[in-house]
Swiss-Prot record:
Protein name: Solute carrier family 15 member 1
Gene3D superfamilies: MFS general substrate transporter like domains
Region (Extracellular domain (ECD)): 383-585
Reaction(s) the record says it catalyses: a dipeptide(out) + H(+)(out) = a dipeptide(in) + H(+)(in); an L-amino acid tripeptide(out) + H(+)(out) = an L-amino acid tripeptide(in) + H(+)(in); L-alanyl-L-lysine(out) + H(+)(out) = L-alanyl-L-lysine(in) + H(+)(in); L-alanyl-L-proline(out) + H(+)(out) = L-alanyl-L-proline(in) + H(+)(in)
Function: Electrogenic proton-coupled amino-acid transporter that transports oligopeptides of 2 to 4 amino acids with a preference for dipeptides. Transports neutral and monovalently charged peptides with a proton to peptide stoichiometry of 1:1 or 2:1. Primarily responsible for the absorption of dietary di- and tripeptides from the small intestinal lumen. Mediates transepithelial transport of muramyl and N-formylated bacterial dipeptides contributing to recognition of pathogenic bacteria by the mucosal immune system.
Entry membrane topology: Multi-pass membrane protein
Family classification: Belongs to the major facilitator superfamily. Proton-dependent oligopeptide transporter (POT/PTR) (TC 2.A.17) family.
Gene: SLC15A1
Keywords carried by this UniProt record: Cell membrane, Glycoprotein, Membrane, Peptide transport, Protein transport, Symport, Transmembrane, Transmembrane helix, Transport
Side Extracellular, residues: 22-53, 104-118, 183-198, 298-327, 383-584, 641-645
Residue ranges of the TM segments: 1-21, 54-74, 83-103, 119-139, 162-182, 199-219, 277-297, 328-348, 362-382, 585-605, 620-640, 646-666
Amino acid sequence: MGMSKSYGCFGYPLSIFFIVVNEFCERFSYYGMRALLILYFRRFIGWDDNLSTAIYHTFVALCYLTPILGALIADSWLGKFKTIVSLSIVYTIGQAVTAVSSINDLTDYNKDGTPDNLSVHVALSMIGLALIALGTGGIKPCVSAFGGDQFEEGQEKQRNRFFSIFYLAINAGSLISTIVTPMLRVHECGIYSQKACYPLAFGVPAALMAVSLIVFVIGSGMYKKFQPQGNVMGKVVKCIGFALKNRFRHRSKQFPKREHWLDWAKEKYDERLISQIKMVTKVMFLYIPLPMFWALFDQQGSRWTLQATAMSGKIGLLEVQPDQMQTVNAILIVVMVPIMDAVVYPLIAKCGFNFTSLKRMTVGMFLASMAFVMAAIVQLEIDKTLPVFPKQNEVQIKVLNIGNGAMNVSFPGAVVTVSQMSQSDGFMTFDVDKLTSINISSTGSPVIPVTYNFEQGHRHTLLVWAPNNYRVVKDGLNQKPEKGENGIRFINSLNESLNITMGDKVYVNVTSHNASEYQFFSLGTKNITISSTQQISQNCTKVLQSSNLEFGSAYTYVIGTQSTGCPELHMFEDISPNTVNMALQIPQYFLITCGEVVFSVTGLEFSYSQAPSNMKSVLQAGWLLTVAVGNIIVLIVAGAGQFSEQWAEYILFAALLLVVCVIFAIMARFYTYVNPAEIEAQFDDDEKKNLEKMNVYSTVTPVSQTQM
C-alpha cells in the first residue's frame, strides 16, 4: 500500500507540484548539457567531426539503454521513490564532474591558454557522461509512473491532465535550456586566459540537477510510496526463455504443433500471463524497424548542429548560435502537438479517412526521411561556400606583397605576379613532396630562393616587400572560426614595432614586417587604435574602423602609411564569411518535428493502448530501447561510411529510412488491433466462473459411512 499524508490543491495531489518541478529542472539539466556536447568535443577536446559524432551518439544510446536497469531496480529492489533519489545523486555527481572536466585552467600548467594534458579532461568527461547516462536513464521510467501513482481511483481526468502538464514541463525545460546554455558558452572565462566558458555552461545544468533533487526530496512526506511488487520484466523474460527451451526439447515431429510458440510455456506458466506476453511480443515485433527513425531524429544534436557552424546566424535582428538552432524543434513541438490533436486529426476524421496509429507512424517516418533530403540540399549550398583546407600531406600558400613594387613568385608549375599592396588569388595547394622550390624576383633584380620548412597540413602566407626581403608566416587557422566569430590578424609593414587595440583586445608588440596571431571578434564594426613611438605623426588620427564583420570569416589587416605619413589599413580576406543563413535549416526542423509529433507521440499512445495493464512498463522499456538502437545505427553507418561529402551521408540516411518506412507500412497492414482490457476481463470472468464452481462443490455435504 502507498503511504502519504493527504494534501490537495484544486482537486490534485499537492505532491505532483514537486514532481513536475523536478522533471522541469532535470530536463533543463539534461538538454542543456546535451546541447553543448558536440561542440565541446569538437572545439575543447579537439576531436574531428566523425569522432565527436560517434561519442555523442554512444552517450545518447547509453541514456536509453539504462532505463531497463532503472526499471529493474525500482520494481524488484528499491521502489520508485528510492530509485529516483539514489540515481539523481549519481546524476548530479556526473553533471558536476563534466563541468570540472571543461575547466581550461585545470591542466594549463604553462598558462598559455591551452590544456597541457587533454587526457585528464577526456577521462573526467567520460566518467561524468557515464554517471549522467546511468542517472538520467535510470530515473526515466520511474518519474512519470511515480507521478501517476499519486492519484486516487476516480481521478482519471486529473491523472490525464497531469501527464499533459508533465510533457509540457519536459519541453519547457528542453526549450529554455537550449536557449540559455549556448548563451553561457559564448561568454569567455578563465584564470590564465579567456576561453569559451564551458564550465559555466555545464555548471548551470549541474546546479539545476541539484535543485531538481532537493525539490523532489522536499515533497517526500506528501508522496504515496508503494513497495516493489516484483519484477514483471523478469517474469516476461523467464516465460519467453522457458517457451523457447521447451519448444527446442520437443522439436521432433512426434510432438503435435501448438498454435503459438509461446504456448510451449503452458507447462509452467498460467494462460493469463502467456496471453499478456503474446500481446507484448506482437507490439515488440512492430518495434523492429523503429530505431531507424531515431537514428535520423537524434542527429539534430550532432550533424545538424555541426552543419549550423558553417552557416550565418544573422536572422533579422537576432544573432543565433549553432547549438541554439535545436530550440526550433522544442518550440515547434509545443505549438504543433495541440494543433495536431485539436485541428488536424479531427479534420482528417471528418474527411472519412481512417488515420490509425500505425498509419500516422508511417507518415512520421516518411516526413523524417524528407527532412534529411532537405538537410542534404542545404549542405550542398553550404559546400559551395566552404574554403578548402590542406590535407595532411599538403600545404597551402598565398603571396601577400606589402612592398611598393610588383613582385614575381615562381612555384613548381606556376608563376604568380603580385602588384604592390595586394595578394595572390587565394591560397594555392601543393603536395609537400612536389614543393621543391620557390623563387622571388622583380624587374632588374636577381632571383632569390625561398628557404623555409613548410609544415604540412597548414596554411602559410609568404610576405614579400623586396626581392631579397620576405618572411613566411604560418597561419593559425585550419578551420572556420568557431561560434560564428571572425578571425583578425595584423601585418605591420612599417619600420617600427606597433601595439594595436581592436575592440577590447590588444595585439602587443607586432614587429616590423611581421604578422600577429589571430584574435576573434563577434559581428559588427570595431574601433582599431594604433600606438607608435616614431613613424606615425602625432597629428594623425590613430583610431580607425574595421569593416563590418559577419559570421565565420577571417581577415588580414596590413598597416601601411599614406603619403601624409598617417596610417592606413589594407584589408585582405583569408576566409570568406558564412553566407548560407541558418534560417534555411528551419524547413528540415519543421519536417522532423512533424515526423516526431505523428510518430513519437502516436507511438507512445499505441504502445499504451495495446499493452496489458501490468506490462505497460515492459513496452515503455522496449520503446526506449529503440531510441538506443537508433543511436547505435548512427555509429555504424557514420563509422563504416566515412563519406567525403556530408550531403551523401544525409541522402544515405534518408534512403534507409524510406526503405524501412515501406517495410513498416507492410507490417502495419497485417497487424490486428486488440483491446487488452477486454481480453483481461474475459480471463477475470473465466476465473470467477471457476471459483463459483469450486464453491458449489465445497458446499455439498459428504455422505459418511457408519462403522459396522
